[in-house]
C-alpha cells in the first residue's frame, strides 16, 4: 500500500539540503555575512508554504511503487520535491517584485523586508541555482540525470512564457479588456501554473523510478495539464466567490486587472451595456468600482457558469483517468490523488 507524506516528514529533509547548499557556497569562500544572508533567503522563501508541489513527488513515487518508500527512496523523492519548492520560491520572489505585491504567506514579501529591496532579484537567481547544486550532488550518477536537468530547464522556460503572456496581457496600470481572451487565458494558466505545479512533480517521480517512457510521460501530461487548468480556474473563482476566512486572503483579482477566468467568461456573455460597466469599473484600485463588478458577476450568474464548467471538466478528466494504460508502470491512482485534493475545494 502507498503511503502519503506529512508536511512534518517532508520538512525534516530540508535542513540537510540547506546544509549542502551552504557547504557548496562555503567552498567558494563566500564571506560569513553573505552566507547568513543566503541562509535567511533560503529559509524565508522556501519554507512556510503548504508544500503541495514538493510533497506530490514522494506521494506519487509511493503510489507508483505500490508501497511505502524506503528511507533512501524517501530522501531522494523529497529532495526532488524540495527542488520544485525552490523553483516555486524563485518564481514567487520574482513575481512579487513584478507585481509590486505587499504580502506573501501572511508576511511582507521578501523584497519588502528590511534591507532587502532589489537584492531580492539576485536572491531569486540564487534560489534557482540551488536546484542544480542539489541535483548534481544527489543525482549525478542517476541514469536519468540529464532528463532531470532538461525537465527543470524546460518547465522553467514554460513558466516564464506564461508569466510574459500574463504581464503583457494585463498590465496593472493600463486596463484594456480588448486584450483579454479565453485563448490567452488558457495559454497563461497552462504555461504559468499547470506545468510546474502539476506535471513537474509527477514527471520527477517517474524519472526517479525510471518508468518515464515517452508513452507514460504523454499520458501524464495529457491529464495533468487539464487538471492544472481546472485548478487555476477554481482559484480565480475562489478569489471572488470564496470566503476570505477559508482561502486565507482577500481576493484582489478585480482591482489588479487580472486576466482571470471570471472576467473572460463575463466578456463572452455580456450585453453592450454590461460591457460598458466592465470597461468603466474593472482593474481600478477602488472598492466601490470593485463592488460594481462583483454585482455584475452575480447578475451574470457566473457562479452557475463556473459550477457547470467544473462538472464538465471533472467529467472529462475522470474519463481520461479511466482510460490510462497501466501496463508500463503508470497508475491511475496518481491522478485520482491529485483530483481528490482539488475537486470542490473551498481554499
From Swiss-Prot:
PROSITE patterns: POLYPRENYL_SYNTHASE_1, POLYPRENYL_SYNTHASE_2
List of residues binding Mg(2+) 1: 95, 99
Keyword Zinc carried by entry: no
Catalytic EC class: transferase
SUPFAM superfamilies cross-referenced by the UniProt entry: Terpenoid synthases (SSF48576)
EC assignment: 2.5.1.10, 2.5.1.1
Cofactor note: Binds 2 Mg(2+) ions per subunit.
One GO CC term on file: cytoplasm
Chemical reaction(s) catalysed: isopentenyl diphosphate + dimethylallyl diphosphate = (2E)-geranyl diphosphate + diphosphate; isopentenyl diphosphate + (2E)-geranyl diphosphate = (2E,6E)-farnesyl diphosphate + diphosphate
Amino acids binding dimethylallyl diphosphate: 104, 192-193, 232, 249, 258
Job description of the protein: Catalyzes the sequential condensation of isopentenyl pyrophosphate with the allylic pyrophosphates, dimethylallyl pyrophosphate, and then with the resultant geranylpyrophosphate to the ultimate product farnesyl pyrophosphate.
Name recorded for this polypeptide: Farnesyl pyrophosphate synthase
Lineage: Eukaryota, Fungi, Dikarya, Ascomycota, Pezizomycotina
Gene name as annotated: fpp
Amino acid at each position: 500500500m502507498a503511503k502519503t507524506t506529512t508536511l512534518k516528514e517532508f520538512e525534516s529533509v530540508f535542513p540537510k539540503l540547506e546544509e549542502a547548499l551552504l557547504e557548496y557556497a562555503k567552498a567558494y569562500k563566500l564571506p560569513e555575512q553573505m552566507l547568513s544572508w543566503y541562509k535567511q533567503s533560503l529559509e524565508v522563501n522556501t519554507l512556510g508554504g503548504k508544500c503541495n508541489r514538493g510533497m506530490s513527488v514522494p506521494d506519487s513515487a509511493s503510489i507508483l511503487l505500490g508501497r511505502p518508500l524506503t528511507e533512501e527512496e524517501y530522501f531522494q523523492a523529497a529532495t526532488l520535491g524540495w527542488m520544485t519548492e525552490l523553483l516555486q520560491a524563485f518564481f514567487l520572489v520574482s513575481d512579487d517584485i513584478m507585481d509590486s505585491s505587499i504580502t506573501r504567506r501572511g508576511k511582507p514579501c521578501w523584497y519588502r523586508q528590511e534591507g532587502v529591496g532589489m537584492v531580492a532579484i539576485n536572491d531569486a537567481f540564487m534560489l534557482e541555482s540551488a536546484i542544480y547544486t542539489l541535483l548534481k550532488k544527489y543525482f549525478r550518477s542517476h541514469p536519468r540525470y540529464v532528463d532531470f536537468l532538461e525537465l527543470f530547464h524546460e518547465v522553467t522556460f514554460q513558466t516564464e512564457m506564461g508569466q510574459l503572456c500574463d504581464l503583457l496581457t494585463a498590465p496593472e496600470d493600463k486596463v484594456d479588456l480588448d486584450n483579454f481572451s479565453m485563448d490567452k487565458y488558457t495559454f497563461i494558466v497552462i504555461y504559468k501554473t499547470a506545468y510546474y505545479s502539476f506535471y513537474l512533480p509527477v514527471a520527477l517521480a517517474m524519472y526517479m523510478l525510471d518508468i518515464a517512457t515517452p508513452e507514460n510521460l504523454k499520458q501524464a501530461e495529457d491529464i495533468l495539464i487539464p487538471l492544472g487548468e481546472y485548478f487555476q480556474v477554481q482559484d480565480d473563482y475562489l478569489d471572488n466567490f470564496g470566503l476570505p476566512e477559508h482561502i486565507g486572503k482577500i481576493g484582489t483579482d478585480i482591482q489588479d486587472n487580472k486576466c482571470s477566468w471570471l472576467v473572460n467568461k463575463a466578456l463572452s456573455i455580456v450585453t453592450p451595456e454590461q460591457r460598458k460597466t466592465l470597461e468603466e469599473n474593472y482593474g481600478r484600485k477602488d472598492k466601490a468600482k470593485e463592488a460594481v463588478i462583483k454585482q455584475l458577476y452575480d447578475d451574470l450568474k457566473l457562479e452557475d457558469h463556473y459550477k457547470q464548467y467544473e462538472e464538465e471538466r471533472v467529467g472529462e478528466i475522470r474519463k481520461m483517468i479511466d482510460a490510462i494504460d497501466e501496463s508500463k508502470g503508470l497508475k491511475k491512482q496518481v491522478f485520482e490523488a491529485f483530483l481528490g485534493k482539488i475537486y470542490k475545494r473551498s481554499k
